[in-house]
Swiss-Prot record:
InterPro entries tied to this protein: KH_dom-like_a/b, RbfA, RbfA_dom_sf, Ribosome-bd_factorA_CS
Organism: Shewanella frigidimarina (strain NCIMB 400)
Region (Disordered): 119-143
Name recorded for this polypeptide: Ribosome-binding factor A
Gene Ontology molecular-function annotations: ribosomal small subunit binding
Pfam families: RBFA
Sorted UniProt keywords: Cytoplasm, Ribosome biogenesis
Subcellular location per the Swiss-Prot or TrEMBL entry: Cytoplasm
GO biological process: maturation of SSU-rRNA
């Protein structure tokens, strides 16, 4: 049986798609730049929507400037999205920076560094002599 999705989840998914389209095509503000909409959480009464976004920049000052620009543009974005969606109540948009992507990349780099260090230590302490298993097998064949 297929998993059922609640109405708020379906609206959140559609809102995410529409926001991505509007931010990519209709927003001309150079302060915002390239924005990725990662997730949208809509309140049960559809009055608020938390929009989780990421940017290419990792500098916290630039990220905060972009979030501020999105916050100022939120009523305009809300109007554009409302024209695309058929909802009685269009949620108020709250833009939030999603740092999970940056944190995930940082964690992945740390794991890679640890693996490389372990390989280097293993190669350092492993002798360069050939395995004794071949000579043992060879002796058994001679018997």
């Amino acid at each position: 049986m297929a998993k059922e999705f609640s109405r708020t989840r379906r609206i959140a998914q559609q809102l995410q798609q529409e926001l991505a389209m509007v931010l990519q095509r209709d927003m001309k503000d150079p302060r915002i730049g390239f924005v990725t909409v990662n997730d949208v959480d809509v309140s049960r009464d559809l009055s608020y929507a938390k929009v989780y976004v990421t940017f290419f920049e990792e500098d916290t000052e630039l990220v905060q400037q972009k979030i501020d620009a999105l916050t100022v543009a939120a009523p305009y974005v809300r109007t554009l999205v409302a024209g695309r969606m058929k909802l009685r109540v269009m949620p108020e948009l709250r833009f939030i920076y999603d740092s999970s992507l940056v944190e995930g990349m940082r964690m992945s780099n740390l794991v890679t560094q640890v693996i490389n260090k372990d390989k280097a230590k293993q190669q350092q302490f492993t002798p360069d002599t050939p395995d004794n298993s071949e000579s043992v097998d060879g002796e058994k064949e001679q018997d």
